[in-house]
Amino acid sequence: VGAPDMRNKLMTEGKLVTYGIYFDVNKDVVKPESYGTLKEIAAILNEVPDVQVKIVGHTDSDGADAANLDLSKRRAASVKNELVKSFGVNGDRLVTDGMGESQPVAPNDTPANKALNRRVEFIKL
């Protein structure tokens, strides 16, 4: 249940970074093509019901800092809502936060690098 590598990253390493959760530009609605990734994460969470997780949204540097911070928080909340509503994860186990553009994993100098910075992280609490 759940991809073994994803399960290992979250449960053993304590952090799972995902790039398979998609949103339209400046929007916080989870796109349908994200459901495969969400389904795998939900399977892991439902398999280990006592684990609590923080969902953290990140953006690239396009746009104003404050707008990106707000957007990242709204996106993390949307991911939580989808996990609860569509995949039966207990929402009491999930907290959300957003970092905006403050923690890039790559320079924001190319479209490919910006895509790396647009991510959702799941952190075991």
Language-model-detected regions and their locations in the chain:
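Periplasmic peptidoglycan-binding/tethering modules of Gram-negative envelope proteins
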Residues: 1-52, 85, 89, 125
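Periplasmic OmpA-like peptidoglycan-binding domain that tethers envelope proteins to the cell wall
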Residues: 29-35, 48, 56-125
